[in-house]
Swiss-Prot record:
Top-level EC class as recorded in UniProt: hydrolase
Organism from which the protein derives: Glaesserella parasuis serovar 5 (strain SH0165)
Family: Belongs to the peptidase M24B family. Bacterial-type prolidase subfamily.
UniProt keyword Phosphoprotein present: no
NCBIfam families, sorted: PRK13607.1
Protein name per Swiss-Prot or TrEMBL: Xaa-Pro dipeptidase
PROSITE patterns noted in UniProt: PROLINE_PEPTIDASE
Listed EC numbers: 3.4.13.9
Residues bound to Mn(2+) 1: 252, 333, 378, 417
Summary of the function given for this chain in its UniProt record: Splits dipeptides with a prolyl residue in the C-terminal position.
A GO cellular component annotation in the UniProt record: cytosol
GO biological process: proteolysis
Amino acid sequence: MQQLFSQHIARIQQIVQHALELARLDGLWIYAGQAKYHFLDDQTSPFKINPHFNYIFPDPTVEQSWLFLDGKNKPKLYFYAPQDYWHCTPNPPTSAFFADEFEWQMLTDSQQIQQYIINPTHCAFIGEQTELAKSLGFEHINPQKVLNVLHFERSIKSEFEIECIYQAQLTALAGHHAAKEAFFASKSEFEINLAYLQATKQSDNNVPYGNIVAINQHSAILHYTKLDFTPPCERHSFLLDAGTSYLGYASDLTRTYAFEPQSEFAAMIAQMEQFKLDTIADMQVGMNYLSYHTQMHRWISQMLHQFEFVKLPADQIFEEGISRTFFPHGLGHQLGLQVHDVAGFQQNHRGTRKAPPEIYPSLRCTRDLAEGMVLTIEPGFYFIEMLLNQWKNHPLAPFFNWQKIDEFKRYGGIRTEDNIVMRATGAENLTAKAESISSR
C-alpha cells in the first residue's frame, strides 16, 4: 500500500498544481471539517469528513485538521490533537504507511491554525465551514475552477484508491453472508442489520450509507431504512443493500434472495443477476454509460413480456416507457470516497455538465467510460404501487396482468449490484473478484 499511496500523492500533486495554475492561486487549504451540533443542543451528529481532505489524507476520522498543498512541496498536515478528558482524542498516525508523505505539525488548540495561514487572499479554501474561512481571511472559498479540476480527476481512481475499494468489497461480503444467514434463520430486519454490523465490525455511525435491510414488500421502497423489530409472519423475499468503507473508500453491494428457491420469483432474480453480469461483460472504454442503461431497459422489457406481467411485445413495452415503471432508478453511479461519487455528469476539467435525458431523470452518470473509473452496476425490478397506479387508467391498462402484478407485490422487488473498475480491456468486477477469494 505504501508504494501505491506514494504514486497516489504524486498524482494529486500534479492535479493540485494544474488547478492552482488555472485559478491563478498560490496554494490550497483544505479543512477536514467538524461535527455539527443539533439545534439548541450540546449533542452532535456523527462526524463526516470533507472528502477532499480524505482524498489526500487516508484517515476519515481526523476532525478539525488542516492540509496545505501547493502542488510542488510535500503536503503539510496540521493535525488537531487536543488535550481533553471529556472525549476520546485522536492518536496521530505518525507510523502509518502514509505518514512519510506529509510534513506534520500538531495543533492542540483549533485557534493555532491562524499562525500558519500566510497570505490567505492568494490561496483557495476547500471545506464546508465558509464562515470560518472568511474569519481567517480567505476570499477564494470553494472556487469553482479548482473544484471542477478536483472533481473531474477524482472520477478517475488511482491504483491506491482501487485497492481500497477492493478491500471494502471483502468486508462487505462478510456482512452480506451473515445477513443472508440471519434472514433464513427467521430474524427480524433489526436483527439482520445487527448481524451485518457485527460481521463487518461497523456501527450505524460509520457505515458509508444507511443499510437497506428489506424483507418482503419493503424491497419496493428504494431507500428503505426503517428496520422492523418484529419478524414477519411470512417470508417471501429479502433485499440487502449495504457496504463498508476502507480508509474512507466505500463499497456498495446489493443482493436479493427468494425464500422459496424454486419459485418464479427466484427465476426472476437469476435473470436479473445474468443481466447484470452481461452488462459488465459488455462494458468498454469510450462507450457512454447511458447506452448500457438503455440496454438494461430493453432487457427489463423482455422480462416483463417473458414473465407475462405485460402482454405486449418487448419492443412496444420499451417504446411505451413501461419498463421505467418497473426499473425507475439509474443503472448505477460513480463510487469512491462518496457513495454517489462526484463528476457523474461532468464532462471535462472546465465543469461542462451533461444532464440525464428527461425520460431517465434518476440516471447518475452521463459520462463516456474512461480507464480508472469505478462504478456500480445495479439493475432493479420492482412492484411499486405508486408508479403502477399511473397505468391503471391508461389506454394500455388492459395489457397489464394486474392479477399477477398484485400477487408479486408481496416480494417488493429485486436489485443486484456489483462494483466495477474500467480497465483498458473492459470492466473488472471487483465484487466478483472478492467473492472468489471469500468463497475459498
